[in-house]
Amino acid sequence: SFKQRHKGKHVLQGWPPVPGSGLPAAIGAKVANPERMVIDIDGDGSLNMTIQEMAVCHRYQLGVKIMVINNQWLGMVRQWQDMIYKGHRAASNLTDKLVVGKSVGEQIEESVDVYPDFVKIADGYSVKAERVTSHDLLEDAIKRMLANPNEPYLLDVIVEAEENVFPMIPAGGTYRDIIMNLDELENRIKVMRQDQGSNI
C-alpha cells in the first residue's frame, strides 16, 4: 500500500484512466514544483504511449522518477476482457512471449526476455534505469532511484502477469459502483453473466 505523508501531494487522473498521461503529467508536476520529488507510477502499456517524453526529462534534467509496474499487458484492457468476455483476450498482451508469470515476490531468471526492454530504451535517452525481478531487491532499488533528486530515473518492476488493478469502476458506472478487490470483481462478473445470460 501507498502511504501519503503530505496532504494534496498525490496527483491522480481520475476515472476513466487516460493511458499515456502519467509521464507527461509528472513532467508538468516537476516543472511546477522543481524542489519536490515527483514519481510517475505507471503501467508498461501506458508508459509505452508517451515514452519519448524521457527525452524531455534528460534534456532539461528534470528529476522525474518513473516506476514502471510491468506485467507485459495492457492491464486494464485485459482485466475488462476477463470480466466481460470470459477471458477471451485480444490485442492486450504486449509481447508474443508470456515470459512474465511470476510474482515480484519470486525470483525470475535475469536472462528472461522482457519486451519492450525499458532499461535499454531509457539508456537510449541517457536516463539511468534498472529492472527489479524480486521483492527482496525492491526496497534497495527504490533507494537508488530516489538517491539523486535532480536526475531522471526509471525503475522497471516486474510483477505477476495476471495482477489486477483495484479500485476499478465498471463500464457505465459511477464512483458508487466502485469495485475494490478481486472478490467484488468476481461477484460482479457472476451477476453480469446471470443478468445477460450467455452473451458474455
Regions found by a protein language model. Name each.
Residues F2-I200:
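Thiamine diphosphate
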